[in-house]
Amino acid sequence: MAAGGNVLGSTFEDLRDTIALIDDKDRVGVCFDTCHAFAGGYDLRTPEAFNTTMDDFERIVGVKYLRALHVNDSKAPFSSHRDLHANIGTGFLGLRAFHNIVNEPRFAGLPLVLETPIEVRDADGQLVKDDKGKAQEDKNIWATEIKLLESMVGMDVESEEFLKLEADLARKGKPERDRLWEQNEKKKEKEAAKGAKKGKGKGKKVEDEEESSELSDVESAGGE
């Protein structure tokens, strides 16, 4: 879903059409990946955006096919079509998106699978390295994130507890968000420049065709 373009499964409509081709649907299921969806242009960040996305999923695909969720934040910006997983609350999705998820009745009883990085970072988001300069890893990060997700069930997003969690995690993810934002902006600039160059070439071709047509008309008139 993150890739978009000509990749099958990049939209809810793709999933719907694929499922429609299967005769025996008893074992058909869809896994909803939060990072993939966000990168593919499906917003989850506010209650309104989240409800719109999930209502669209229910209407187009059918919530009966939803079997599991892969729960990841996104290092890359919204609709960037880049599948780059981030730790919960540190990416462009942000902690409120995951508050929406853990409090969504339609997800009750579904398995939520973490696919987040296990690189150790300090409070400012810098990688913690060992004596040899190698980035440290810690699988206990997953246990911490599971507890974080569980703690947000029923939590008030305007409470002091939530706001502190949100701020701390956003701070931790800022270096990676800034880095990926810059990459995304450069990519858009290159694409815009490429499009402008292509447009100029097309305009020149039209001008040449018009000039050629005018010359033909003159020659034709002279011949008469």
Feature roles, as predicted:
Residues V28-F32, V102, A108-L110:
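Glycine/serine-rich loop-strand microenvironments at binding/catalytic pocket rims
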Residues M1-T90:
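Acidic/histidine-rich catalytic cores of soluble enzymes
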Residues E58, G62, G94, D178-W181, ...:
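Glycine-centered helix-coil hinge/cap
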Residues D124-E224:
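Mixed-charge, low-complexity intrinsically disordered regions
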